[in-house]
Amino acid sequence: QLREFHKKFACAANGVISVFGDVKAEEVVKLFEKSFASMPKGALAFENVEKPVPVAGLAPATAHLDKKQAVLMLGFQGASVNDSDRIPLELITEASSDLGSRFFNRIREQMGLAYFVGAAQFCGLAPGAFLFYLGTDPQKIEPVTKEMRSEIQDLATNGLTEEELTRARAKLLGGEAIRNQSNSAFGAAVAVDELMGLGVDAHKRRKEEIENITLDDTRRVAAKYFNSDSRVEATVLPPDKKSSTN
């Protein structure tokens, strides 16, 4: 099984080589042609990627671990890397994760219900996941869960505000500009873009794509993905005192 797995994936058709820096392209090409001459061409392993089955009506899951804090995650099926909804979701991620976010201000600062709060998006060739998460005192898990649901519902109904979108756009573009100053980071990003089918020039379109997202886009995407019927909730709590003493 390991040999078959290696044969299927470790082939030229599934590989991308990214070289950034002060190099001579002709010499680099010759070097890699020599080094990988014996690698089989193979075939693309992910031409037809199955989409995950949408979930609905799942009961919240709870786990008890040897931790002092409680952690809550509320997840939704997300977008794929090739989906036009991915960028509005990226902006929603940024707007929901910094110290100026509605979640931070309402849940942590105003209500004192969380230690940290944010959002994260995971994308692949198949639709991934979008998560809202927080850490809190185990005694506050019920009120903070209620408030988190309420804030997500408001986001699903109204999308981002003008201030949130402007801030998120500036953060996203600024962060990428800083990361791309590193040859290794820029090269890795371009390699992944090519592997995912976005093309080596995807970064050239990136700024315009982000700047073109409107408030209506965020409202449409939030309503599409953050449906309470398809929400998956997971909570991690400290050990149950009753069961631990028995």
Regions picked out by a protein language model, each given a short descriptive name:
Residues 44-102:
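His/Glu-based metal-binding/catalytic segments typifying zinc-dependent metallopeptidases
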Residues 1-44, 80, 110-246:
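Charge-rich, well-structured scaffold segments of protease-associated domains
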